[in-house]
Design a protein with these regions (language model features):
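RNA-contacting regions in translation and RNA-metabolism proteins
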Residues: 1-155
């Protein structure tokens, strides 16, 4: 997670600087005052958030704002987090033409999740979003097609 040391004239100033520089809400940070001397405060600021939960919260809020009934399930393995969205009748709308809407949703979710990691010291997480098992079914169909074409070429 991101962390940084700040020296400023007040804790309020440190909070404002940290929010601006780290790009994270104040509620997602932990402030540890190291020293207070000569009208200066030295503070160690650490990001204290669960990025995987933030991604799920974003997707749930997105569904709610779009008036789409559905739920989001998350699966985590190694450094990959997969969000599986299940809806009754909005899969096509969320996937979009040529999967563009799904890809955009995955990209935005990845930005939200990885904003909590320091790119200089951490790799962050690989974020995948799937809607109604679309990506899994698509991968299976592509594998079958590749196998069929390979057999035709071999003849």
């Amino acid at each position: 997670m991101k962390e940084k040391m700040y020296v400023a004239s007040s804790l309020t100033e440190v909070e404002e600087l940290a929010v601006k520089e780290l790009g994270v809400a104040k509620d997602d940070m932990y402030f540890d005052v190291i020293s207070e001397e000569n009208n200066e405060v030295q503070v160690h600021v650490m990001v204290d958030a669960n990025p995987v939960k933030k991604g799920k919260d974003f997707l749930e809020k997105f569904l709610e704002e779009a008036n789409i009934l559905g739920f989001v399930e998350r699966k985590m393995r190694d450094n990959v987090v997969e969000y599986c969205i299940t809806t009754e009748n909005a899969n096509g709308l969320l996937i979009g033409k040529n999967s563009k809407t799904l890809s955009a949703l995955q990209y935005i979710t990845s930005l939200i999740v990885n904003q909590y990691f320091d790119p200089e010291t951490e790799n962050g997480l690989i974020v995948k979003v799937d809607i109604g098992d679309y990506r899994r079914r698509r991968d299976e169909n592509l594998e079958k097609m590749a196998t069929r074409i390979a057999k035709e070429v071999a003849k």
